[in-house]
UniProtKB/Swiss-Prot annotation:
One of its GO terms (molecular function) is microtubule binding. Its cofactor is Mg(2+); K(+). It comes from Xenopus laevis. The lineage of its organism: Eukaryota, Metazoa, Chordata, Craniata, Vertebrata. This is Developmentally-regulated GTP-binding protein 1. Expressed in many adult amd embryonic tissues. In adults, highest levels in ovaries and testes, followed by skeletal muscle, stomach, brain, kidney and liver. Weak expression in heart and brain.
Length: 367
């Protein structure tokens, strides 16, 4: 472990010394690829034994979505969780109170959302300091990350946490790079770009792939990509998670300062202690989770509007709905009757591939 950390420090120092220009792009690409490989060794150490990377921290996934609270010790994560979910996470006025993951559940708009108060991150978590590695391993399984910041401490904290999460392959508020990557048996590296590239050229791409011992592949760049984008695609273990920055303790700043904070993208100012602005926070959480609620209607009865079946927006076909209810339901599926915004007529007869929209009502007709 210490050998890997030393090599990471050497490469980071060399990258800091190297000026960024066209002439050094090849060399920097090579260094970035080496760095990514070493980081991967830290995330998944070689050799068996011991628990997984999130040992002792992970909590069984329940509900329709999972949110992780990440932040430095004593920024108010536990207070926020206890006031949001009514869970009493041990709150104290000294740093490092929460030493294991504390789960809570909040019900909002019919959805059951699991909240995880993850232990405070210290700088250097991605290098295995503190219990940061386990914390970040749990953060990778979340549908949304809330980075809780103390409004009085500068946004330097924000940068440190982002770097820690980035080092563990978590990309915040980003889409996966639009890069096609396909390994093949022969034919060398074949690079095609559908738009002008400011950073990547043939030599840089080859140097990065050579570091991964890939000498035959088809690469298609569909956007102006960076060396980091290409490395993310080759590594293939990146997770893309939406993120909200929660600025806590706004009771200690002026109205003018609050106006400035409101203009920062992905930010919600709150006071966990006074429960100020929780409505705004919950509304933003709902927007970022992009959940779809489907109501059920048993034959000959009124729809049940009390407990919707909640689906992620990427899987909202009638088939996904059936699978969520019971894995065998799809085998008995004949057709479905749907009322709501996804159909032209109410009700409309649809097949298993029909894509449902938020607050649709569905009745399944079995064979």
């Amino acid at each position: 472990m210490s050998g890997t950390l030393a090599r990471i420090a050497e490469i980071e120092a060399e990258m800091a010394r190297t000026q960024k220009n066209k002439a050094t792009a090849y060399h920097l690409g090579l260094l970035k690829a080496r760095l990514a490989k070493l980081r991967r060794e830290l995330i998944t150490p070689k050799g068996g034994g011991g628990g997984g990377p999130g040992e002792g921290f992970d909590v069984a996934k329940t509900g329709d979505a999972r949110i992780g609270f990440v932040g430095f010790p004593s920024v108010g994560k536990s207070t926020l969780l206890s006031n949001l979910a009514g869970v009493y996470s041990e709150v104290a006025a000294y740093e490092f109170t929460t030493l294991t993951t504390v789960p809570g559940v909040v019900r909002y708009k019919g959805a059951k959302i699991q909240l995880l108060d993850l232990p405070g991150i210290i700088e250097g978590a991605k290098d295995g300091k503190g219990r940061g590695r386990q914390v970040i391993a749990v953060a990778r399984t979340c549908n949304l990350i809330l980075i809780v910041l103390d409004v009085l401490k500068p946004l330097g904290h924000k940068k440190i946490i982002e770097n820690e999460l980035e080092g563990f392959g978590i990309r915040l508020n980003k889409q996966p790079p639009n890069i096609g990557f396909k390994k093949k048996d022969k034919g060398g590296i074949n690079l095609t770009a559908t738009c002008a590239q400011s950073e990547l050229d043939n030599d840089t791409v080859k140097s990065i792939l050579a570091e991964y011992k890939i000498h035959n592949a088809d690469i298609t760049l569909r956007s102006d990509a960076t060396a980091d984008d290409l490395i993310d695609v080759v590594e293939g273990n990146r997770v893309y998670i939406p993120c909200i920055y929660v600025l806590n303790k706004i009771d200690q700043i002026s109205i003018e300062e609050l106006d400035i904070i409101y203009k920062v993208p992905h930010c919600v100012p709150i006071s966990a202690h006074h429960r100020w602005n929780f409505d705004d926070l919950l509304e933003k959480i709902w927007d970022y989770l992009q959940l779809v609620r489907i109501y059920t209607k048993p034959k000959g009865q009124l729809p049940d509007y009390t407990s919707p079946v909640v689906l992620p927006c990427s899987h909202t076909a009638a088939e996904d709905f059936c699978t969520k209810i019971h894995k065998n339901l799809i085998k008995e599926f004949k057709y479905a009757l749907v009322w709501g915004s996804s159909v032209k007529h109410n009700p409309q007869k649809v097949g298993k591939d029909h894509v449902l929209e938020d607050e649709d009502v569905i009745q399944i007709v079995k064979k």
